[in-house]
């Protein structure tokens, strides 16, 4: 890839960091309350484009970007590991440890904390250590650490460690490898975290490893990429109105189409029209790290208003996303102003 194309791609990715994190906030504001709002069909149909169609795009897109950037880098394997130690492992250990400490404080004041059905006060040393990995249940790869969204960082760390192996696999199999795991992912009826991670990370890695220019590819086949984006979006939304076969595969294929569309078109569009904030981009990883605990407080709120009409639920949901995001950004701004060095460390030098 030439310097111009790489710069264009880098600008798109940088511009998209906060919008993609925002999609994850949309997702978790929904999943934290979905058990309460079940049965509100109008509510579900109205928020689906934001909560699940866009909401479930964020993590696959970040896996794709991570694979793309890791192999575009000219650093050695050891240098990449050192870099990811700061950008991934330190934040992973810090924020999971912080959540455990908060839980222990709540236990001290008489609260009962259950994690995966087990009382935290009964935890052994092994249980505490395992809480950093999967909270005591691996669940075929769908288990998450004590800070649930960090399954993404856990899987990304594993993929970075295995990157030399993935390099040779992709060098000789090219798209065959991500396509095989992609077929398993789109047809898996559980969350399929492992297959999602492998599919999107290896798909992103394919471009630099096999010397394919993503920007040039999009410009050459723009009609195909844009057409796929709209086709899979329509097929995904269609199941809201009628029962269709292969609804889940269409949904997951739409996540792949969204990823290509956002990186190759939408990010560039935002940058060219100056719809971009450097501050918000820098805050995005911190927002990802702390947003989830705030979303868990939404369930009692939705339990109180569950009897109201669906439009009120939709408005409450949208306001919840705005409030959670603003709180996280405000906390970031305050901490950055009073403890900039500390924020730099816990966010992996992303400030």
Where are these regions (language model features)?
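Membrane-cytosol interface segments of multi-pass membrane proteins
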Residues: 1-181, 305-351
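Alpha-helical transmembrane segments and terminal signal-anchor/GPI-anchor hydrophobic tails
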Residues: 4, 199-202, 210-286, 292-302, ...
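Hydrophobic residues within membrane-embedded alpha-helical segments of Major Facilitator Superfamily
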Residues: 23-26, 61-63, 200, 207, ...
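Aromatic-anchored segments of alpha-helical transmembrane domains
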Residues: 26-29, 96-97, 178-192, 227-241, ...
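Interfacial loop-to-helix transition and helix-capping segments at the boundaries
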Residues: 47-59, 141-154, 185-202, 236-262
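Short glycine/serine- and small hydrophobic-enriched flexible loop segments
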Residues: 68-72, 167, 205, 209, ...
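Loop-centered beta-sheet repeat module
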Residues: 162-211
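Transmembrane alpha-helical segments of multi-pass membrane transport proteins and ion-pumping complexes
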Residues: 205, 260, 296, 325-333
